Curated annotation (Swiss-Prot):
Molecular functions (GO terms): rRNA binding; structural constituent of ribosome; tRNA binding
Organismal lineage: Bacteria, Bacillati, Bacillota, Bacilli, Lactobacillales
GO terms under biological process: translation
Name the UniProt record assigns to this protein: Small ribosomal subunit protein uS7
This protein's record includes keyword GTP-binding: no
Cited PROSITE patterns: RIBOSOMAL_S7
Chain's role: One of the primary rRNA binding proteins, it binds directly to 16S rRNA where it nucleates assembly of the head domain of the 30S subunit. Is located at the subunit interface close to the decoding center, probably blocks exit of the E-site tRNA.
Organism: Lactobacillus johnsonii (strain CNCM I-12250 / La1 / NCC 533)
GO cellular component entries: small ribosomal subunit
Length: 156
């Protein structure tokens, strides 16, 4: 934590092709070793696959997938009286999008399709249909929060 007050958040620029800040954030999460051009070409190829398979606008499918992946609740560990409790807390909006993007990309990387653009496209389409590993992760996080609802009065 900084000693000299809060640091101002840097705002990402909207994507030049789809004019969406969420798409830019997804490109930044896809990027490895600063290779942004490679990450954006992977994403645009994935969006092309989504367009071909669904016939819908790929950004709309992606936003629907993000709504199905972003968590509302999560648990945080807190030590009280010598034992650790998992306390359910609401997720801030910025953290919701970050977690959703992180889960989408990480579970897309674990898939078995041949190229990364196929993996990403299929993971986004699965998430839009409320299936897939990223949605399962969200359900697991919500299940943990629900199971520990008894400790909700230990606020952070």
């Amino acid at each position: 934590m900084p000693r000299k007050g809060n640091i101002a958040k840097r705002d990402v620029l909207a994507d030049p092709v789809y004019n969406s800040k969420l798409v830019t954030k997804l490109i930044n999460h896809l990027m490895i070793d600063g290779k942004k051009a490679k990450a954006s070409s992977i994403l645009y190829d994935a969006f092309g696959i989504i367009q071909d398979k669904t016939g819908k606008e790929p950004v709309e499918v992606f936003e629907e997938a993000m709504n199905n992946v972003m968590p509302v609740l999560e648990v945080k560990a807190r030590r009280i009286g010598g034992s650790n409790y998992q306390i359910p807390v609401e997720v801030r909006p910025e953290r919701r999008t970050t977690l959703g993007l992180r889960w989408l990309v990480s579970y897309a990387r674990l898939r078995n399709e041949h190229t990364m653009d196929e993996r990403l496209a299929n993971e986004i389409m699965d998430a839009a249909n409320n299936t897939g590993s990223a949605v399962k992760k969200r359900e697991d996080v919500h299940r943990m929060a629900e199971a520990n609802r008894a400790f909700a009065h230990y606020r952070f």
